Curated annotation (Swiss-Prot):
The entry's keywords: Acyltransferase, Cell shape, Cell wall biogenesis/degradation, Cytoplasm, Magnesium, Metal-binding, Multifunctional enzyme, Nucleotidyltransferase, Peptidoglycan synthesis, Repeat, Transferase
Organism field: Shigella boydii serotype 4 (strain Sb227)
GO molecular function: glucosamine-1-phosphate N-acetyltransferase activity; magnesium ion binding; UDP-N-acetylglucosamine diphosphorylase activity
Protein name: Bifunctional protein GlmU
Any one of the GO CC terms: cytoplasm
Source taxonomy: Bacteria, Pseudomonadati, Pseudomonadota, Gammaproteobacteria, Enterobacterales
Enzyme class, first EC level, given as a word: transferase
Underlying gene: glmU
Length: 456
């Protein structure tokens, strides 16, 4: 179906008292992203011409968190109901566009469901998203005559007979801009709450002889709202279960789908294996045959084919070439890069450092602001001393260098190709190619020396 241009209104003015938080409710995160950001992303994916965000409490925090989104900010100074919120946005509606109404605390609404709702909207009428519940207590009921939707009655205003209706309003609807503005202008607050209900436009449309078409979401979780942290945690598990299922069906081996969290986007090759309690954040790419051990956190990184990341390793903003091995208990910070076949072992930290092909840093090492060549051995306890208290400096190590244990390289410094650094050395000057650098104090030995003893 050919759709009109469309704008989206997202209601996000609520305080979220039951969250017991200083943070606006819609900024609490699901899968590592603010609830309202999920909704904004869905609106943008639908091709919304404009996204109007109706806000109230915590406006400064919202604007700071969402500063990168192209939003039209609409203030609702007093929270007088959903209809009142839409009235604040109405001056921005074009007559010839469709207006889709969404909620910042309903984060799992899918683009597919919204597109079906958009396609189903009748000319001059309203598309309405509804669901049927075994226990509809507290929700607005859908009233019908001869199968046609005639209105929505809120639970507090419903008769005993109406409260037996199981079909309820989700709050998500779409209509033409000109019609929406006209109906909004007719709303009153003559109800138990003393608020302006957006749901009253359904009856107004019916009275004008307009058609109202109800559409159901694919999953109930799509229209579940969040009012407290318990509800948020439940939706988190729903979301994670869905993501895990998609990955399993796509060929990724998750050892326990219930103990896997995806907080971003995962692109993967074939025969990828992910153990328990792994967290994927941001945009992550895993090549073919990658193995990730338990307890790892991988964020905004590209992991090449045949890499193996051992348990409890943290990788952030990193590029790993093929066949690298990492961990356990390693930390690769932003700017770390490993070339093919490189190895980083336990309790090694890297930042803004490149480790060349076949090079290895086995244990207890810090490599920062460093460029390390191919086939280099970094001994245990090696530290690149890159910071003088004010500025950072670089360490350059050529190919085929052997760095002994407990070595400090005080940057800026360069170690030439094939050089050897003796264990316990503090390198403060450049080392030439194929040279031996040693700076430790000569060993002395005192025969028959006795350790001090405690006085009685």
């Amino acid at each position: 179906m050919l759709n009109n241009a469309m704008s989206v209104v997202i209601l996000a003015a609520g305080k979220g008292t039951r969250m017991y938080s200083d943070l606006p409710k819609v900024l609490h995160t699901l899968a590592g992203k603010a609830m309202v950001q999920h909704v904004i992303d869905a609106a943008n994916e639908l091709g919304a011409a404009h996204v109007h965000l109706v806000y109230g409490h915590g406006g400064d925090l919202l604007k700071q968190a969402l500063k990168d989104d192209n939003l039209n900010w609409v203030l609702q100074a007093e929270q007088l109901g959903t209809g009142h919120a839409m009235q604040q946005a109405a001056p921005f509606f074009a007559d010839d566009e469709d207006i889709l109404m969404l909620y910042g605390d309903v984060p799992l609404i899918s683009v597919e469901t919204l597109q079906r709702l958009r396609d189903a909207k009748p000319q001059g009428g309203i598309g309405l998203l509804t669901v049927k519940l075994d226990d509809p207590t507290g929700y607005g009921r859908i009233t019908r005559e001869n199968g046609k939707v005639t209105g929505i009655v809120e639970h507090k205003d419903a008769t005993d007979e109406q409260r037996q209706i199981q079909e309820i309003n989700t709050g998500i609807l779409i209509s033409n801009g000109a019609d929406m503005k006209r109906w909004l202008a007719k709303l009153t607050n003559n109800n138990a709450q003393g608020e302006y209900y957006i749901t009253d436009i359904i009856a107004l449309a019916y009275q004008e002889g307009r058609e109202i078409v109800a559409v159901h979401p694919q999953r109930l979780s799509e229209v579940e709202g969040v009012n407290n942290r318990l509800q948020l945690s439940r939706l988190e598990r729903v979301y994670q279960s869905e993501q895990a299922e998609k990955l399993l069906l796509a060929g990724v081996m998750l050892r326990d789908p219930a103990r896997f969290d995806l907080r971003g986007t995962l692109t993967h090759g074939r025969d990828v294996e992910i153990d328990t309690n792994v967290i994927i954040e941001g945009n992550v790419t895993l090549g073919h045959r990658v193995k990730i051990g338990t307890g790892c956190v991988i964020k905004n990184s590209v992991i090449g084919d045949d890499c193996e990341i051992s348990p409890y390793t943290v990788v952030e903003d990193v590029n790993l070439a093929a066949a690298c091995t990492i961990g356990p208990f390693a930390r690769l910070r932003p700017g770390a890069e490993l070339l093919e076949g490189a190895h980083v072992g336990n309790f090694v930290e890297m930042k803004k450092a490149r480790l060349g092909k076949g090079s290895k840093a086995g244990h207890l090492t810090y490599l920062g602001d460093a460029e390390i060549g191919d086939n280099v051995n970094i001994g245990a306890g090696t530290i690149t001393c890159n910071y003088d208290g004010a500025n950072k400096f670089k360490t350059i190590i050529g190919d085929d260098v052997f760095v002994g244990s407990d070595t400090q390289l005080v940057a800026p410094v360069t170690v030439g190709k094939g050089a050897t650094i003796a264990a316990g050395t503090t390198v403060t000057r450049n080392v030439g190619e194929n040279a031996l650098a040693i700076s430790r104090v000569p060993q002395t030995q005192k025969e028959g020396w006795r350790r001090p003893v405690k006085k009685k």
